[in-house]
Amino acid sequence: MAAALLVIAWDASAAGPLLVADTFTATTANMTPAGVNLRMQIIQWQDAAARTEVVATLAADPDASTLAKLPTVGYVWPNGSPVGYSVKYANHAPEPDGKERVTLVTDKHLGSYDFKGWSAATAGGSDKPYSVIELELNSSGTGTGTFSLGAEVLLDEAAGTVALKPGGQTLLTNVKRAAGQADKGSRP
């Protein structure tokens, strides 16, 4: 029995701490609740095959319980909340003008843990059981963003990508990449 406990403790310590590939912060705006600070931690940027698997799952069965079974590649943490949202899709796409687009999909819609759910100032968003978050960053790592509460979700199964329909409300302001993470080589 003591040997079994020793092996379990050894395995747990061998895993070590989870390393974070990238961290972004943002503040909710033009919605209820406004002013909520979010921290988005990416443990691992996904390759094309992993992203395609998530998109196929979303296209076949957009039920959150099915999405929850996919590997977790990050978390979205609302400020002051002990509960975060699991990120199941994480894509980083540099754009020709030096900007970058970050797209994340969580297995539950943002605000689902709150007593009163989150709502956008104007209609036009998605009622999916998950959230799609898009961040638009300039070359200095700052910008704005939105998520599926304020924009329609677009799935491209052939390309294995998720996006939000252009022109959606800006629901995330003060978007920033955490200091010291702008030049990480961990992005596919």
Residue ranges and their predicted role:
Residues 1-8:
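Bacterial N-terminal signal peptides
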Residues 9-15:
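Boundary at the C-terminal end of the N-terminal hydrophobic targeting segment
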Residues 15-98, 105-110:
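N-terminal secretory signal peptides
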Residues 74, 83-188:
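Mature extracytoplasmic/lumenal regions of exported proteins
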